[in-house]
C-alpha cells in the first residue's frame, strides 16, 4: 500500500527552525515574573504546576517555579518540556501545586517538530476560534491572540490567556471545523 503525504495544514508543517527559538515566550515569562502573576504550567506529560515564576534564565531556557512570588522553594521547568503556560487571573480560586522537577521534565513523547503557524494565523485573521489537540490527550479551545514559529497564544472561555507550545500538539483545527 502506498503511503500518502498529509497536505492538510491542521497537521502542521515541518518546523523550519530547530531547536526552537523561545525568545518571544521569554518576554512573556519575564512579564509574568515581574508582575507576580500566578501561572499554571503543564508539561508534555500532563504534569501540572500551579504557582509563580520565581526566577527565569533565558540563556538556559529554564523557569524556576515556586509556591510564592520570588519564593525560595523552586522547581526547575525546562522550556523544552513545557506544553502550556497559562496565566491565572487574580479572581481565580486556585490551589498551589508543585511537582518534583524530574516528574515535570520527563519527556514521555517525542517533540513533533511541527509548525502550525498557517492554521493559527488563518483562524486569527478570520476571527474564528481554534481547537488544539495535545499529544497527551487534552483538547483546548479558544480564540487565538497571536502566533509565531513555536507557539500560539489562546484566550480561553474563562478569560485566561495561555501560550501553547507546538512541539506537544498533534493537530489544530478551527473551532467551527466538523469532521
UniProtKB/Swiss-Prot annotation:
Keyword terms of this UniProt record: DNA-binding, Repressor, Transcription, Transcription regulation
UniProt keyword DNA-binding, yes or no: yes
Disulphide bridges: none
GO molecular function annotations of the record: DNA binding; DNA-binding transcription factor activity
Domain of life: Bacteria
Record's function text: Transcriptional repressor of the FliC phase-1 flagellin.
Protein name: Repressor of phase 1 flagellin gene
Amino acid at each position: 500500500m502506498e503511503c500518502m503525504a498529509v497536505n492538510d495544514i491542521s497537521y502542521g508543517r515541518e518546523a523550519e527552525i530547530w531547536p526552537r527559538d523561545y525568545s518571544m515566550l521569554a518576554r512573556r515569562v519575564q512579564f509574568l515574573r515581574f508582575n507576580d502573576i500566578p501561572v499554571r504550567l503543564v508539561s508534555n506529560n500532563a504534569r501540572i504546576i500551579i504557582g509563580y515564576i520565581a526566577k527565569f534564565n533565558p540563556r538556559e531556557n529554564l523557569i524556576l517555579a515556586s509556591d510564592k512570588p520570588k519564593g525560595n522553594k523552586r522547581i526547575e521547568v525546562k522550556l523544552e518540556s513545557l506544553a502550556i503556560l497559562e496565566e491565572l487571573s487574580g479572581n481565580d480560586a486556585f490551589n498551589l501545586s508543585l511537582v518534583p522537577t524530574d516528574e515535570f521534565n520527563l519527556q514521555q513523547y517525542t517533540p513533533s517538530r511541527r509548525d502550525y503557524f498557517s492554521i493559527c494565523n488563518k483562524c486569527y485573521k478570520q476571527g474564528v476560534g481554534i481547537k488544539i489537540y495535545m499529544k497527551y490527550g487534552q483538547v483546548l479551545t479558544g480564540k487565538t491572540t497571536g502566533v509565531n514559529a513555536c507557539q500560539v497564544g489562546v484566550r480561553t472561555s474563562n478569560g485566561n490567556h495561555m501560550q501553547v507550545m507546538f512541539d506537544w500538539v498533534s493537530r489544530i483545527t478551527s473551532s467551527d471545523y466538523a469532521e
